[in-house]
From Swiss-Prot:
Signal sequence coordinates: 1-29
Protein name per UniProt: Xylanase inhibitor protein 1
Species of the source: Oryza sativa subsp. japonica
Subunit structure: Binds to fungal GH11 xylanases.
InterPro entries, alphabetized: Cts1-like (IPR045321), Glyco_hydro18_cat (IPR001223), Glycoside_hydrolase_SF (IPR017853), Glycosyl_Hydrlase18_Chitinase (IPR050542)
Protein location: Secreted
Length: 304
């Protein structure tokens, strides 16, 4: 696919980073990383994926959601965005060294993994429809573009077999070493542990965990204060030291909620504390539509 040149340096760079981490230790990850992730695909008025990447604000954009799977049907909901241009937009983002992930799950109820076989079937579809599998006869909604990784946003249903799905997806790294690697991330609720994702996360195959410190009054800053956030943050970072843990923030106050952290409190109180973690990874914003309205990310970017 396009951006092979971009990926060609990933292997040698990974080797350098691995050596560096052995020499310097995980403490090198503490403090600002400059990494900011945003979710895209939940509102047609947020603009195109290309426009999102052209803002220069984000280092990763997560397409949401691949929301129908597990029962022989596979489909996504991108809120009316034109599928015909998304493939080209993915390549455009990748050409700017912005990673594009596909998030599976979401708020709908049309997904689950009733058996280990269904997990294998879903992994097969994701690999061939959205990544570098490209088996003939498998519909590719984004054409020949391949996403950089898969995000697990399992917010509904039973927790069964998501660990199997993670293992099946990750196994493609051994089967196709010369191709685009399968990178796994998870987006979880802030209260530790997230019961739907615990078994999957315990596989230790997830390089990032985006923890949503919103939508839950027990651990969102505006409701629970710094102590409420840190009580959960410290559990996430301690339990998964091999994963980069991202601070998930609401880019606006959704009607009926008060989860958007005021800029001054974010800068002086929240970020200095979460960035003490050795495996702090960056900031995740929900979502592009709200960020476009408020401009929250334009300020937060420099503190991530």
């Amino acid at each position: 696919m396009v951006a092979l040149g971009r990926r060609s340096w990933l292997v040698p760079l990974a080797m350098v980073l691995a050596v560096s981490s052995c020499l310097a230790g995980p403490a090198m990850a503490a403090g600002k990383t400059g990494q900011m992730t945003v979710f895209w695909g939940r509102n047609k008025n947020e603009g195109t994926l290309k426009e999102t990447c052209d803002t220069g604000l984000y280092t990763t954009v997560v397409i949401s959601f691949y929301s129908v799977f597990g029962h022989g049907r596979y489909w996504g909901d991108l809120s009316g965005h034109d599928l015909r241009v998304i493939g080209a937009d993915i390549k455009h983002c990748q050409s700017k060294n912005i990673f594009v992930f596909l998030s599976i799950g979401g708020a709908g109820k049309d997904y689950s993994l009733p058996t280990s076989k269904s997990a294998a079937d879903v992994a097969d579809n994701i690999w061939n429809a959205h990544m570098d599998g490209r088996r003939p006869g498998v519909f590719r909604p984004f054409g020949d573009a391949a996403v950089d990784g898969i995000d697990f946003f399992i917010d509904q249903g039973a927790p069964d077999h998501y660990d199997d799905l993670a293992r099946n997806l990750y196994a493609y790294n051994k089967m196709y070493r010369a191709r685009t690697p399968v990178r796994l991330t998870a987006t979880v609720r802030c209260a530790f542990p997230d019961p739907r994702m615990k078994k999957a996360l315990d596989t230790k195959l997830f390089e990032r965990i985006h923890v949503r410190f919103y939508d839950d009054a027990t651990c969102s800053y505006n409701h629970a204060g710094l102590a409420g956030v840190m009580a959960q943050w410290n559990k996430w970072t301690a339990r998964y030291p091999g994963s980069h843990v991202y601070l998930g923030l609401a880019a606006a106050n959704v009607p009926g909620k008060n989860d958007n952290v005021f800029i001054k409190q974010l800068y002086y109180d929240l970020l200095p504390n979460v960035q003490k973690a050795k495996n702090y990874g960056g900031i995740m914003l929900w979502d592009r539509f709200y960020d476009k309205q408020t401009g929250y990310g334009k300020t937060v970017k420099y503190w991530a």
